[in-house]
């Protein structure tokens, strides 16, 4: 390894190790069931949400209890189920477009790591409309609050509902963009075994 690069890497590691306790990590607040999601959105006066998921989750009707709870509270739901494994820039842009066109006020990420990453990146693009995902690659390149983001994980293991990371793939070049920013940590999560 190039000695200058090695010194840079070691310095970066040292600085991050020292700074880590002072960085603004937060744990998502846990919501109590699907009714807790509806109550939160009602309290925040949000009348429509974007539900980001995938076709597999939708085909098993896993989103129905949440959809019914939101409908019962008078909250409209726009469903983006085009997320694929290793979400692409095109997925993110389609979700972002749906959010804006339908006048949504929050994003619910429902599913595994791919749905979470797609929702986080769509939120980042909504927060930074003039900044493409390719320029958000790396550490702390979003630096703006996202729309309200609620994570509903359906898998155990990815931990995307608590992380500051999202990985998006460029469908043409197959380059993966790791986006790491504290703004990507969802402020709320629903951990419901049902």
Predicted features by range, described:
Residues 58-130:
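N-terminal small/polar loop signature for handling phosphorylated ligands or for N-terminal nucleophile
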Residues 54, 82-83, 194:
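Short strand-loop junctions, especially beta-strand C-caps/beta-turns
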Residues 127-194:
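A glycine/threonine-rich phosphate-anchoring loop and its flanking beta-alpha core
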């Amino acid at each position: 390894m190039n000695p200058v690069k090695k010194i840079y890497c070691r310095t970066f590691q040292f600085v991050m190790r020292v700074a880590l306790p002072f960085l603004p990590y937060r744990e998502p607040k846990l919501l109590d069931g699907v009714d807790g999601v509806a109550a939160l959105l009602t309290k925040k006066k949000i009348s429509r949400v974007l539900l980001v998921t995938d076709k597999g989750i939708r085909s098993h009707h896993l989103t129905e209890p949440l959809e019914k709870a939101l409908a019962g509270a008078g909250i409209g739901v726009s469903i983006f189920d085009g997320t694929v494994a290793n979400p692409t820039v095109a997925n993110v842009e389609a979700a972002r477009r749906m959010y804006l066109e339908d006048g949504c006020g929050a994003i619910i990420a429902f599913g595994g790591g791919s749905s979470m990453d797609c929702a986080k990146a769509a939120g980042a693009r909504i927060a930074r409309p003039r900044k493409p995902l390719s320029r958000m690659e790396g550490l702390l390149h979003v630096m703006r609050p996202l729309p309200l983001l609620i994570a509903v994980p359906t898998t155990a293991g990815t931990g995307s509902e608590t992380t500051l990371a999202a990985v998006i793939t460029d469908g043409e070049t197959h380059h993966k963009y790791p986006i790491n920013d504290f703004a990507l940590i969802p402020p709320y999560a629903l951990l419901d075994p049902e």
